[in-house]
């Protein structure tokens, strides 16, 4: 049975930690769902992990709908959160509501997620008032990383911490059903988590959050350019993928693949086709 927003909020109340991972396609979403993941996040991180961009900014609504729909087809009963891409909610409440509706109707997600604090509260309220659950995102917000001075830890000084704390409270008042806290000191995340009734899901925010999220490509060791401090590799798949492909190339070039067990046969003598004597 598919989880609901009520179920996820109840996990916080019961002290049950929430597990969330990104997924971008049907095959991976099926595997993660089979493993028992609580939440699948179709993140705009797909811009870097799947589409080859150097940030999340170029990701479009069409990109998000395409990948969300694939994830939903792979895991029809999973609880799916979908990112609203940059530009889909910054132009006003009406645009935000229409785009959020599209993600639910065409993408099939259960909740939309957007970045920002007090400034996005009117948009959050408008989307929630339209009957669409919203998850917030504070701390390091990748869509506006350039304004923050790059991909850096946020909330280290008291002024920034006070603002983030206040933003979390305002987002809760605006109606969010959960909050991602990214790259902030563990102590700050713990205080924010204790101050709001909705679940917090951390990424680089310590153990004090109600749950944790990682990018699947990072967690499985598929991305080798760099490893953020907050990432733990639960597998190292990149070397295995390379080795498997190298083995395949070697066998193809040597004529060792395909073998008899991989080949279809027939009792027909097809060589007569070459002589034209098959009439």
From Swiss-Prot:
Mg(2+) binds at residues 44, 83, 115. Its EC number is 2.1.2.11. This is 3-methyl-2-oxobutanoate hydroxymethyltransferase. It holds the Pfam family Pantoate_transf. Disulfide bonds: none annotated. Coiled coil: none annotated. Its cofactor is Mg(2+). The active site is at 182 (proton acceptor). CDD domains: KPHMT-like. It is an enzyme of class 2 (transferase). It comes from the Bacteria. GO terms for cellular component: cytoplasm. It is found in: Cytoplasm. Gene3D superfamilies: Phosphoenolpyruvate-binding domains. 3-methyl-2-oxobutanoate binds at residues 44-45, 83, 113.
């Amino acid at each position: 049975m598919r989880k609901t927003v009520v179920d996820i909020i109840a996990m916080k109340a019961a002290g049950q930690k929430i597990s969330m991972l990104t997924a971008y396609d049907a095959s991976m979403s099926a595997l993660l769902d089979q493993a028992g993941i609580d939440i699948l996040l179709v993140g705009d991180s797909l811009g870097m992990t799947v589409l080859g961009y150097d940030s999340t900014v170029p990701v479009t609504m069409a990109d998000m709908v395409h990948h969300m729909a694939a994830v939903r087809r792979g895991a029809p009963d999973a609880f799916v959160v979908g990112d609203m891409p940059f530009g889909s909610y910054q132009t006003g409440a009406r645009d935000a509501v229409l785009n959020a509706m599209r993600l639910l109707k065409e993408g099939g997600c259960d909740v939309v997620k957007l970045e920002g604090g007090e400034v996005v509260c009117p948009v959050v309220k408008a989307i929630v008032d339209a009957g669409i659950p919203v998850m917030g995102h504070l701390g390091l917000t990748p869509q506006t990383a350039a304004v923050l001075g790059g991909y850096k830890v946020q909330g280290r000084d008291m002024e920034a911490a006070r603002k983030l704390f206040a933003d979390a409270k305002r987002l809760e008042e605006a109606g969010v059903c959960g909050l991602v806290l990214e790259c902030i000191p563990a102590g700050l995340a713990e205080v924010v988590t204790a101050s709001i009734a909705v679940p917090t899901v951390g990424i680089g925010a310590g153990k004090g959050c109600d749950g944790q999220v990682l990018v699947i490509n990072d967690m499985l060791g598929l991305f080798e350019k760099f490893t953020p401090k907050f990432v733990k590799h639960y597998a190292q798949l990149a070397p295995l993928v390379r080795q498997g492909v190298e083995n395949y190339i070697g066998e193809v070039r040597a004529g060792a693949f395909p073998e008899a067990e991989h080949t279809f046969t027939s009792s027909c003598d097809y060589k007569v086709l070459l002589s034209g004597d098959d009439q």
